[in-house]
């Protein structure tokens, strides 16, 4: 089928090439032979009057022209899929769908493992690809590259639907031998101490505790930066450094890693974890099914989170 001289099938080929970056893998993903995909590249080059892809170390590297075309092509194909082609109904017990989800290591540990266990019972063929928080999750939502984001609601995009999961609060933690955490932690002492902090992506995007501190006008002395939360408790051992962590994560590590826990010197720093999905997937039966499971499991965590948040917090050590 042609539209203004362009064979629309070539757009499917272009999208596959941008996704896979290898000729054989791209051909396989859309059920073409390798010679047919090579021919498609030739026709694309002729139509757009550009090389589009260059071979470097056995990978196809897109030209600036291809990079510029890719988002519009992906969005057009998604609109066709979602608006013209009917979604297949999801039968959980028979589905082999794979969900791609961006979330922190903290949320994987304290929450999403519950979702995985439930899905394993109800839909054993369903699988997951859990991805690190990166520099531009909004672009990945827009392109349809992701099924879900799970992040604090401060980091949610205004252009895609979202729902709240549960609330948590931040506490300060350190090694049990850290004498500077004895007694009530003052803001002055908090600011004078060395900190371990999680930051994400190539641009070191701040995590929720850094974001909240900056909102209050404070900038800590961060001495160690790590790409996630889960390694922080071990990095505090045998040092006088401190960290600011979600209470749910601290509770998770209590049985295995000795920590001294104190209230944060600022007013209660609470935050809400939220779920977001692409607007284009809003009516997708599979997305709706997974969305409901995630929200149901979150509702079970909320009660325990609220109970933790209401406990009186004196200095404690384990």
Swiss-Prot record:
DNA-binding region: 23-42
The organism of origin for this protein: Rhizobium leguminosarum bv. trifolii
Assigned keywords, A-Z: Activator, DNA-binding, Nodulation, Plasmid, Repressor, Transcription, Transcription regulation
InterPro entries: LysR-type_TF, LysR_subst-bd, NodD_PBP2, Tscrpt_reg_HTH_LysR, WH-like_DNA-bd_sf, WH_DNA-bd_sf
HTH lysR-type domain span: 6-63
Pfam families in the record: HTH_1 (PF00126), LysR_substrate (PF03466)
Molecular-function GO terms, alphabetical: DNA binding; DNA-binding transcription factor activity
Family annotation (Gene3D superfamilies): Periplasmic binding protein-like II, Winged helix-like DNA-binding domain superfamily/Winged helix DNA-binding domain
Keyword Lyase attributed: no
Name under which the protein is recorded: Nodulation protein D
Functional summary from the UniProt entry: NodD regulates the expression of the nodABCFE genes which encode other nodulation proteins. NodD is also a negative regulator of its own expression. Binds flavonoids as inducers.
């Amino acid at each position: 089928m042609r539209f203004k001289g362009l064979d629309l099938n070539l757009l499917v080929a272009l999208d596959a090439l941008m996704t896979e970056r290898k000729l054989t893998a791209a051909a396989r993903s859309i059920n073409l032979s390798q010679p047919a995909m090579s021919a498609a590249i030739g026709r694309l080059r002729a139509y757009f009057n550009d090389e589009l892809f260059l071979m470097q170390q056995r990978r196809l590297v897109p030209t600036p022209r291809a990079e510029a075309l890719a988002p519009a092509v992906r969005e057009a194909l998604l609109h066709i899929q979602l608006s013209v082609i009917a979604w297949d109904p999801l039968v959980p017990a028979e589905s082999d769908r794979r969900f791609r989800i961006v979330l922190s290591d903290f949320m994987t540990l304290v929450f999403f493992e519950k979702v995985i266990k439930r899905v394993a019972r109800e839909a054993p063929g369903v699988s997951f690809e859990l991805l690190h928080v990166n520099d531009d999750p909004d672009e990945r939502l827009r392109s349809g590259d992701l099924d879900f984001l799970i992040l604090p609601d401060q980091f949610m995009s205004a252009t895609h639907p979202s729902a709240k999961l549960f609330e948590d609060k931040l506490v300060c933690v350190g090694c049990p031998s850290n004498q500077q955490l004895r007694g009530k932690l003052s803001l002055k002492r908090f600011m004078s101490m060395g900190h371990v902090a999680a930051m994400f992506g190539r641009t070191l995007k701040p995590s929720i505790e850094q974001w909240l501190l900056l909102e209050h006008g404070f900038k800590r002395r961060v001495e160690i930066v790590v790409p996630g939360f889960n390694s922080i408790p071990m990095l505090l051992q045998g040092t006088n450094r401190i960290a600011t962590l979600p209470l749910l994560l601290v509770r998770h590590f209590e049985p295995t890693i000795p920590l001294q826990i104190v209230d944060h010197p600022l007013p209660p720093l609470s935050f809400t974890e939220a779920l977001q999905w692409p607007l284009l997937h809003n009516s997708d039966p599979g997305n709706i099914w997974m969305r409901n499971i995630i929200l149901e499991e979150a509702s079970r965590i909320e009660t325990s989170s609220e109970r933790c948040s209401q406990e009186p917090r004196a200095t404690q050590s384990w």
